[in-house]
Amino acid sequence: MKVEIINKEQVEQLMPIWGETACICYDTPTKFKNGVAKTVLSTGHFSGSRGQYIYFKIEDVPRSLADQMARHSVGTAVNMQSFRYVKMEDFTYYTPSLIEKYPEAKAIYEDTMEVIKHNYNEIVGILNEKGIKGEKANQSARGILPMNTNTKLIMAFTLEALMNFMEKRLCVRAEEHIRKLAKLMRDEVITIIPELEDKLVPACEAKLFCPEGKMACGKYPTKDQLKEILNNHKK
């Protein structure tokens, strides 16, 4: 799994541009733009940041993870490797940690992947012999590729969308591999914008309660539990 921000120079200017944009709202001199940026970040006034995107190049992740990424559709843009235009003749794949843990399961898993790889190439080869080549052959054979076939994508986030993504995907209830990806993305961002370290956090840390209800891990009270705590405090 690899993660890289590909527009680092623009990301370095995200806070100053956001601050300058917000200055117009308050008729504040632009020399104070850095301070204004920190203020609107803390108060959640994101309108001035919505025209700026952070572009992540993400490689060696399973297609199942890429599909989960694409569910974050507000404030994002995604370009994903096409299994139609790209021949996946020697695809690599993701192995879940629980399968890695048990040799018997891992052996079956790896054997299955090799069978699929062989059969994919056999199908493409047969179609090629019939004069069907390129994307027509690839798109006909791609249906047998497993969900854990590794792929790559470039995904852009506004800051607001990225914070929402982190709230969902840094949660311990998120799948292991997308939580790992979220951590890598977070590390990349805060290297450039340290002010975001306490903003790119799971929902419980952002809200001070857990929105997962009965599925809560117990680190923070649920919303109902927090209400009860506050009501008891008022008595």
What is each of the regions a protein language model found here?
Residues 1-235:
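Family-specific signature for flavin-dependent thymidylate synthase
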